[in-house]
Amino acid sequence: MAQGLTLAGVPLEFLFFALVLGTIAAKPALAGRAAAAGALGISLYKLACSPFDEGAGWHGLLAHAGHEWVGLVNLLALLLGFALLARHFENSRASHALRHALGEGPATGFILLLGVFVLASFLDNIAAAMIGGAIARSVFRGRVHVGYLAAIVAASNAGGSGSVIGDTTTTMMWLAGVPPAAVFTAYVAAASALLVVALPASLQQHRYSPAVRGPVEHHPVDWGSVAVVGFVLCLAIAANLLVNLEFAGWAGVFPFLGLSVWLALLLATPLRRPEWLALPGALRSAAFLLSLVWCASLMPVQALPPASWPVTLAAGFVSAVFDNIPLTALALKQGGYDWGYLAYAVGFGGSLLWFGSSAGVALADMFPEARSARAWLTQGWHVGVAYVAGFFVMLAVLGWSA
């Protein structure tokens, strides 16, 4: 099959994608338009000058879309559904009750991050991050430090990295025959990284806007909204387990997880009506992330370097700007990896930038001040340190076992 154009040996697709990412990092206000323009521009370029993995021209484009649609629709449904779920949680006033339970001082921020980590181990990391963000908004009186927002995303991605139901990439490994125990070892790195992130982030947040119990709320918890949140989460977990345990062959055929979230929201409407006004903002964020995922899927990556721990470490940094699903698919096809390391790298690595993971994009929709690559990198400096530290702790404790 003919190859596309190159510049100094680099396929033009990569240069176009780098231009998109550079624009997003430099001009956050243009992020949505830059991502959409990149998705359209790279698609047109591949139609005219460079074949898709599935073939050239319109046939290749349609075949590629057929290959990607389940993941894209699932992601869209989850981002929109969990945006409505987060509003249910905020409207329940449960976060106000938690504000009194969590207490005061720097330990409050640490405990909340630990809770997000645990929640993400059995729940989608998007939901874990958004629930964590909703609690943080209440506990810290609406003033949440960007460094702490980065820590919430890191905690959610770390929590899902060692669980075969906690992240799409780990589920992919499970479906490909990787034993859950091999993925579970990622928690050695993830737990270490959580400690490195949580300590400075909690102190950052305490200096910026400390947690206070405040006056006793006169409005009781809306248990109807709490019931809706619990129902949606339980149905999502049940659907995820059922599909992957009993109908694994269908997991890549239809967006069952996203559908289950929306089915639960609609079934619960008689009890509590969703706050539909939250959808336009969530849709803009979803369109941004879907455009980036589509761009990443168009990159002509046919193979990864031979598996080793330095390559796996580098994959984590790459996953901050490149969709981790095709990275994981390539690694599974190639083989030779220690899967615990890969699960940690492609999971936690997405926390390095606000647009590096779906959890980050979802949280940035709740807190627009997070949409700054400079602020994320400078104020969330501990995320990068934690990623490297966690990786080398795991290497020292377990060694590399391919």
Q: Where are the regions a protein language model picked out?
A:
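Short helix-coil transition sites and intra-membrane helix breaks within transmembrane domains
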Residues: 28-31, 85-93, 119-131, 159-167, ...
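Membrane-interfacial loop-to-helix junctions in multi-pass transporters
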Residues: 8-13, 71-75, 101-114, 140-150, ...
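Hydrophobic mid-bilayer segments of alpha-helices in multi-pass membrane transport proteins
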Residues: 10-21, 28-56, 72-84, 225-235, ...
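Long, contiguous bundles of hydrophobic transmembrane helices that form the permeation core
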Residues: 194-262
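Transmembrane helical segments that form the transport core of multi-pass membrane transport proteins
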Residues: 231-337
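Juxtamembrane and boundary regions of transmembrane helices in multi-pass small-molecule transporters
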Residues: 26, 32, 85, 91, ...
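Interfacial loop-to-helix junctions that mark the boundaries of transmembrane helices
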Residues: 3-9, 28, 57-75, 179-189, ...
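Hydrophobic transmembrane alpha-helices that form the pore/transport pathway of multi-pass ion
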Residues: 107-161, 172-176, 329-344, 399-400
